[in-house]
């Protein structure tokens, strides 16, 4: 075991420290970029909701609350699982990562107790869905073009 450790140290000694630091820094930047994607929650312009608590948004997307106060059935729409905006939204709103939420839905599907929100592949697709669906709620990157048929909901702590 000691011989393996000495060999490893000898090999690592040959790797320039600057290269090692560069690799670590690059990995850190990639993770920081994934977390730094800002988003906004949107609803159809006909929806009277102007603000929601973070926990309420989570309950809507996890389908723990299935109706708006008007009685209309909530139609949440997610982004693709691998999208940076979904990672940011999931971490901020659900306080979990995408894989944990995927596990939540797999359990509900397996037990016949629910199905996940529909997924769209881009901000434009989410905006289009919310624009034509009065009871929809979605999220898009903060730079997405919204148009007049959707509006942003303020998220409260």
Model-based region annotation:
Residues 1-4, 26-28:
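Intrinsically disordered low-complexity regions specifically enriched for long asparagine
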């Amino acid at each position: 075991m000691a011989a393996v450790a000495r060999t490893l140290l000898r090999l690592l000694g040959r790797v320039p420290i600057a290269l090692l630091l560069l690799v670590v820094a690059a990995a850190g930047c990639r993770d920081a970029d994934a977390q730094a994607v800002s988003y906004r929650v949107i609803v159809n312009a006909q929806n009277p909701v102007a603000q929601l608590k973070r926990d309420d948004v989570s309950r809507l997307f996890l389908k723990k609350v299935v109706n708006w106060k008007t009685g209309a059935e909530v139609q949440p729409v997610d982004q693709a699982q691998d999208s940076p905006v979904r990672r940011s939204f999931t971490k901020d709103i659900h306080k979990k990562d995408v894989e944990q939420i995927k596990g939540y839905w797999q359990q509900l599907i397996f037990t016949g107790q629910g199905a996940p929100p529909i997924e769209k592949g881009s901000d434009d697709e989410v905006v289009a869905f919310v624009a034509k669906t009065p009871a929809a709620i979605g999220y898009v990157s903060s730079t997405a073009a919204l148009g007049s048929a959707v509006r942003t909901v303020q998220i409260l702590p």
